[in-house]
């Protein structure tokens, strides 16, 4: 009981102290912590503190904090929180292709899960269920494709192209696949390769 009280007191006063610090000092501490893979919980805590003081940060810093917080959430098995923070990062820096790539892979996991449901419903020969599961699958694929397209336009690789091709084919979107090169060409003109915070 005493240990719990002491821990709660430490966390409360520690949080109060961080909130009283100059924002530059808190941001520097965050930058240091996020480099240490063994301090994920501390990184989450200080990143949330920074986001609570978002009016004191510039847009580049907000993009950076959200991006790295999303990465920590993805690494610690919280994909929904990761998606939310990657999307928040895109609001501040919409052309950073690494964020698009990360979101693409998080959504791809959902596509894979929904794709299995489509396959299972087809095996059951349940037409209504198959239509329902395919509709949900297609919605998720349609969310996923733009992230991979931006990533592929900015940093082309065979794996991403194969994923895109597979997603288009799995939803029988031949027109989307045929016009993919045109979209990639248009998207590659605006790529951010480094998430700067200054």
Outline where the language-model segments fall:
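Short coil/linker segments at helix-helix boundaries
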Residues: 108-147
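TPR alpha-solenoid repeat register
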Residues: 65, 99, 160-161
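N-terminal leader/linker segments that initiate helical-solenoid repeat arrays
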Residues: 18-63, 198
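Residue-level recognition of tetratricopeptide repeat
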Residues: 62, 96, 157-158, 191
């Amino acid at each position: 009981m005493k240990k719990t009280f002491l821990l709660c007191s430490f966390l409360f006063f520690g949080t109060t102290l961080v909130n009283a610090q100059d924002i530059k000092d808190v941001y520097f501490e965050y930058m240091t912590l996020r480099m240490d893979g063994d301090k994920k919980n501390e990184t989450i805590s200080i990143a949330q503190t920074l986001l609570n003081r978002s009016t004191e940060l510039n847009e580049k810093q907000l993009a950076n904090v959200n991006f790295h917080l999303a990465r920590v959430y993805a690494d610690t098995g919280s994909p929904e929180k990761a998606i939310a923070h990657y999307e928040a990062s895109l609001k501040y820096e919409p052309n950073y292709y690494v964020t698009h790539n990360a979101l693409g892979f998080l959504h791809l996991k959902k596509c894979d899960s929904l794709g299995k449901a489509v396959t299972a419903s087809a095996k059951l020969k349940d037409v209504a269920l198959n239509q329902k599961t395919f509709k949900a699958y297609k919605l998720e694929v349609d969310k996923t494709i733009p992230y991979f397209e931006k990533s592929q336009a900015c940093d082309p690789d065979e794996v991403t192209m194969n994923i895109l091709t597979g997603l288009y084919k799995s939803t029988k979107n031949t027109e989307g696949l045929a016009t993919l090169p045109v979209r990639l060409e248009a998207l590659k003109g605006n790529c951010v390769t480094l998430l700067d915070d200054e």
